[in-house]
Structures are given as C-alpha cells and as structure tokens.
Amino acid sequence: MPQPTKGPRLGGGPAHERLMLANLAAALFAHKSIKTTETKAKRLRPYAERLITFAKRGDLHARRRVLAVIGDKTVVHELFTEIAPLLAEREGGYTRITKLGFRKGDNAPMAQIELVLEPVTPKAKPAKSTAKAAPKSKAPVEETPDEPASEETAEAEAD
C-alpha cells in the first residue's frame, strides 16, 4: 500500500497540493513568470521542469500526460508549440527563482519563478593538449647576485 509523503504539505491535503501546483504550473506557462511565496516556488520548480521535459518529447502520449495534470488545452498547446522549441537545446534548468523580499501584511518570503527562455551558449572548453605540452619546470633557476661580490671587494679595498 503506498504511503503518503511525510511532512507539511502546501494547502493542507495532498489533493489540494496537487491542484495548487497544477494551477501554478499553468500560470507559469501562460505568463512565463509568476510571483509567489518561496516555498511554493521551490515546490513548483521540479514539477514544472518535469512537464517541460514531457513537452520537449512532443509525442501524443506526452501531450496527454501533461493534459492530465494541467487540464487547460490552450496552456498545453502553448507549452508544446511555443515554450518547448525554445528550450529544446537546454538539458535542464528551465526555471529560475529570484527572491523578492517579504510580503507586506503577513511577512511571507516572496519569490519570482520564471522560465529561462534565453538561448544556450556552449561553454568554451580549454584544450587539454596545450596544457600538457607546456609543463612547468619544477626547479626554478636562481641567478647569482653580483652585489655581494662588489661589497666584498669594497671591504677589501678599505682595509
């Protein structure tokens, strides 16, 4: 028999939490950015990224699985046709959470969660062969200073 998750839930029961996360995900996909509490944003992030991964697959089964969660055909269509192609090259990290401070009234910590729609720029990897080709010498070459010899000759002349 499956055991329910332990610990506090958003909104009370597990069904309410599922519905709340589905509504937050639908709002995120519709508006590309939403303002909510930090706790809700942190719980929404893996949920939304999983739905985006389904949308990147783009097949009928993935569309039906996302539709079973969100339920709004227009939002699902926008996710599959507009958002998923923009995130096709990205391998994860589709969302960004920015802390905004505290809400007036109940002092709840607020955050903005948004989709990262900027194109991915591949990082330049340093060439390993050039790093190995020029090994550093372990023993530094020390030059003999000329000044101590001149001081000795100056002392010898003074005597």
UniProtKB/Swiss-Prot annotation:
Residues 143-159 have a biased composition (Acidic residues). One of its GO terms (molecular function) is structural constituent of ribosome. The keyword Ribosomal protein applies. One of its GO terms (biological process) is translation. InterPro entries: Ribosomal_bL17 (IPR000456), Ribosomal_bL17_CS (IPR047859), Ribosomal_bL17_sf (IPR036373). GO terms for cellular component: cytosolic large ribosomal subunit. It comes from the Bacteria. Signal peptide: none annotated. Pfam families: Ribosomal_L17. Gene3D superfamilies: Ribosomal protein L17. Keywords: Ribonucleoprotein, Ribosomal protein. Residues 119-138 have a biased composition (Low complexity). Residues 119-159 are annotated as: Disordered. Belongs to the bacterial ribosomal protein bL17 family. Part of the 50S ribosomal subunit. Contacts protein L32. This is Large ribosomal subunit protein bL17. The gene is rplQ.
